[in-house]
Amino acid sequence: MMKSIKDRSFRPVDVAVAPDGSIFISDWYDPIIGGLAQRDISRGRLYRIAPKGSRYGQPKLDYGSAKECVNALKNPNYCVRYKAWNALHKMGSKAEKELMKMFLSKNLRHRARALWLMGKIEGRSAHFVDMASKDQDPNIRILALRLARQTGTPLIKVIEKMTSDPSAKVRRECAISLTHVRGDKKASLWASLAINHDAGDRWSLEALGIAAENDWDSCLSSWLKLVGDDWDTDKGKDIIWRSRAKESSLLIAKILKDPKVPEKDRPRYFRALDFQDAAQREEALIKILE
């Protein structure tokens, strides 16, 4: 990170990585702080950050073969990567062998770039989504879900295999993916994800909330069938607090009437009633007063 203590005119406004790996920073460099003199129109500075003694040079880049394009796809400069990506995409299945070598490397960013391209090869999307969904790295498994959404690969089959994934962030991505799903299977998949929610994980909770939008009644009902009387746990209360189903208000009322609920937690449940349907909220408030 660059900053200047003495030079008050130093105002870095943009940064870019050059094809040789050096970093360029553009400095607005307004010599007058405040006022309308507009002296910045004809002023400015560029800084290059690189190892000591390193001279700027334009690396030799070629996009004629899959091997050369894959090498360019690893470049830190996004313009180089853009040209490489488009060239590889046009090659289609002819580039698959070289892309697979890149995918099998240890560099996570390189693996992700290769997977995005392989997933766009005509007729191969489902294969690479399936392959990525079984990967040891949770970031690649997340990418499998995003690739499925972008390529139109049936999401239900992908999510079904991943609802019990050991990684919370993969399960969150499953929930986000469910937002795009309609039909009978959605509620049961949502319930499976909700069962695996970790109490206190707000990111997980919000992902589940986004997934259930417009389908709260069926989603919550399916979850309640799975948990039965065991809904009254810390993670179960999380789900109820975030839910917007017809049953939610009365369940919140049960939580509020429970003497074991700490006093410090009660305001959040009362606040949760504000997000429920008015008629059901009134019914719940009457229950609380009884």
Which functions belong to the PLM regions below?
Residues 1-7:
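Blade-edge beta-strand/turn elements of extracellular beta-propeller
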Residues 26, 42, 49-290:
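Long, ordered, helix-rich scaffold segments
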Residues 17-19:
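Residue-level detector of Asp-centered blade-edge/turn motifs that repeat once per structural unit
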Residues 2, 32-34, 194:
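Active-site rim elements
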Residues 28-41:
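Short, conserved, GDST-rich strand-edge loop motifs in beta-rich repeat architectures
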